[in-house]
Design a protein with these regions (language model features):
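FAD-binding subdomain of flavoenzyme oxidoreductases
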Residues: 1-148
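C-terminal substrate-recognition/cap domain of FAD-linked oxidoreductases
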Residues: 108-112, 118-287
């Protein structure tokens, strides 16, 4: 009734939502590694995920903590509401990566499952068109639950691994999701499709059912692991730029790759400009 759950830090992220779903609830933060990452790890890193765009990161979903200090003292930090008197120590500890204390319990916010959810895949022949679409969707007044981008190199890996139905010849795809009340979602989808078409989308596919929706998301969430099919090793980069600068930044990444003979795949949270260029290499090859 109070839309809260008390969990221990070792609980796997996805297991919490799986337990809540039959009752009509879920836990929002959904890192791509949610099948294996823990709530405690998420708290330590202040983890986000695809749905950060509309719902925020872990700190927006934690009300309180039970911690053990370096002196061995057990303390209750925060509480059951956001407006606990005093300093926001919960906010200080979330994202501290275990350097300030040991967390033993976490009070998290849970939310109702949306009445309606629509997942779309916009297919583009240029990275510029895809990235310009992202900023215009937000500028139009629509804030989707998620906007993710994958480029051609990543799509090759994802399809070989997951067979999610993504086109192998696209320069980029946008995985977009709208959720909320049924009428509102229908309006959001119409607006999103319109913006995609304005920016020369080859096609916008709307998941026909829950199974297809889950398959689209499986492709995205398994993307990092799938890269192992095209490269034995890679470095993950993590940076944030304004959405309006995505076209320029992605072009520069491409130019740098050409100049230095690098292979780089792009898979990232486009909606909030959170880039994850993956530099592919093989340490067994001299010089790489």
């Amino acid at each position: 009734d109070n839309l809260r759950a008390v969990v221990q830090p070792g609980l796997v992220n996805l297991h919490l939502s799986n337990a809540l779903n039959p009752q009509g609830f879920y836990y929002v933060p959904d890192p791509s590694s949610q099948r294996s990452c823990t709530i405690g790890g998420n708290a330590g890193e202040n983890a986000g995920g695809p749905h950060t765009l509309i719902y925020g990161v872990t700190t927006n979903h934690v009300f309180g903590l039970e911690i053990v200090t370096t002196e061995g003292e057990i303390l209750q930090i925060g509480g059951w509401t956001y407006d606990t008197p005093g300093y926001d120590l919960t906010g200080l500890l979330i994202g501290s990566e275990g350097t300030l204390c040991i967390v033993t319990k976490i009070i998290v916010r849970i939310v109702h499952l949306a009445e309606a959810v629509k997942t779309m895949v916009g297919i583009f022949d240029t990275m510029d068109d895809a990235s310009n679409t992202v900023s215009e969707i937000i500028a139009s007044g629509v804030i989707p639950a998620a906007i993710e981008m994958m480029d051609e190199m990543i799509l090759q890996a994802v399809e070989a691994d997951t067979h999610a139905g993504y086109p192998m010849d696209a320069a980029a795809v946008l995985l977009m999701e709208a959720e909320g009340l049924r009428e509102s979602v229908a309006e959001q989808v119409e607006q999103i499709v319109s913006v995609c078409n304005k920016h020369h989308a080859r096609e916008v596919r709307i998941a026909a059912n829950e199974a297809e929706r889950q398959l689209f998301w499986a492709g995205r969430k398994n993307a990092f692991g799938a890269v192992g099919r095209i490269s034995p090793e890679f470095y993950v980069q993590d940076g944030v730029v304004p959405r309006t600068r995505l076209p320029y930044v992605l072009r520069r990444v491409g130019e740098i790759c050409s100049s230095y003979g690098l292979r780089v795949g792009n898979v990232f949270h486009a909606g909030d400009g959170n880039l994850h260029p993956l530099i592919l290499f093989d340490s067994q090859i001299p010089g790489e």
